[in-house]
Amino acid sequence: MLLKLYNTKTKSLSDIKNFSDTKVYACGPTVYNYAHIGNLRTYIFEDLLIKSLRLLKYNVNYAMNITDIGHLTGDFDEGEDKVVKAARERGLTVYEISRFFTEAFFDDCAKLNIVYPDKVLVASEYIASMIEVVKVLEQNGFTYFVNGNVYFDTSRFNGYGQMAGINLNNFGRSSVSRVEIDLSKKNKSDFVLWFTNSKFKDQEMKWDSPWGFGYPSWHLECAAMNLDYFKSTLDIHLGGVDHVGVHHINEIAIAECYLNKMWCDMFVHGEFLIMEDEKMSKSNNNFITIKDLESDGFSPLDFRYFCLTAHYRTQLKFTFSNLRACKIARENMLNKLTFFYSSLSQFDMALLNKNCENIESVSENKYYNNFLEKIAFDLSIPQALALLWDIVKDDDLSALLKLLLAFKFDEVLSLGLKEGVLREIERDRVNIDDTMHSLIEERRLAKLRKDFKRADEIREYFRSKGFVLIDTEEGTKVKRG
């Protein structure tokens, strides 16, 4: 089954046809602060895509970058380096800041069940590749050098800005009020490839180059690391919708002028998480971290569930009341699945522990096929989540099949369902003493002679002690209430 995604380049749904070596790249974090939940919504969307591709039998090679240098406080070459600014404010070196927040980012990802990339590309480790890309662009006439910096000449690239629908004659007009005008540029849309000391005197991370001692731009970093790792073309480039109008069109310009051919088939963008009708932003100081949510009593997986309730191309408004509703829904789901699990026979438990794909009832089940169709059609995750609830409520499905399907769906949804159920089962595990054994046997005999009053009395006795009796084909099980 082919997966279709909305391609920002073509403004239409496109099939992903490369099954054998699907090359996917995601713009990772600039590691100068904790990732906020707006950032993490994008990484959850990207995680859902990677897992959907793999469930649909694509052989995915997934890379993500870490920007530890050269990302300015503005996208138009203005401001100062975010990492340098954070290091100065905290009294640390840029290397200490980068290392600390890289670890913090992947810690948050682990809490959210976000898959670790096949390759993490750290910008400061690819300086030689970046310099090589600029050399080739320079040789081919796409750059100019002025006032100590190497610029990309956008007028030399006919396709510049097409993905964003940019008219070069009007470029930057809507942003003039907030952009520091760089008089060194030939065109407003031109951007720096390599900075030297002439631009920012306090830049700590610098390298020697043919153009002087300096550092690369954010746009050059992503393009050069891609070209180094994947060697040539790319199937899917992922990122937030805020990257469409500057960063990603600059990446395209660099890569296509370097390769002299089309670089990436498909660009896919996730929409904003918003608060009070504004996107969440560190620069606006209106952001919430995973640690903040945990301090308020939420599991990171409550937030993941919340993100699953909206399509990735739809803005999602964050409120704590909505998050609480998702927390309740996720806990209800776990409670229902735990109940199903506790009712399984030993034989069914053995089946459950096998790989779901080896059980015919799953692969041929209408719910499973419907789930594949949902994720394959532009990641229709809210509808896929609704199918999970349909399974739980379907009285025609056995407890075993419900669990098999739920756990299979969770290979993509990643709500920690199996782990959560097993944790609840272990928590509810009861060591049954002789008195309990005697009462359970007495209740069994009472039911056989149709003395339901006595059977109910024994059930109520257990309940008064904080236990619940569950009748199964193999006898009565006891769990904590």
Curated annotation (Swiss-Prot):
Metal-binding is among the record's keywords: yes
Annotated EC: 6.1.1.16
GO biological process, one term: cysteinyl-tRNA aminoacylation
Keyword Glycoprotein in annotation: no
Motif 'HIGH' region mapped to chain: 29-39
Cofactor requirement: Zn(2+)
This protein's GO CC annotations: cytosol
Single Gene Ontology MF annotation: zinc ion binding
Residue positions binding Zn(2+): C27, C222, H247, E251
Motif 'KMSKS' region per UniProt: ranges: 279-283
Co-factor: note: Binds 1 zinc ion per subunit.
Pfam families: tRNA-synt_1e (PF01406)
InterPro entries in alphabetical order: Cys-tRNA-ligase, Cys-tRNA/MSH_ligase, Rossmann-like_a/b/a_fold, tRNA-synt_1_cat_dom, tRNAsynth_Ia_anticodon-bd
CDD domains referenced in this protein's UniProt entry, alphabetically: CysRS_core
Superkingdom assignment: Bacteria
NCBIfam families: cysS, PRK14534.1
Subunit structure and binding partners: Monomer.
UniProt family annotation: Belongs to the class-I aminoacyl-tRNA synthetase family.
Listed name of the protein: Cysteine--tRNA ligase
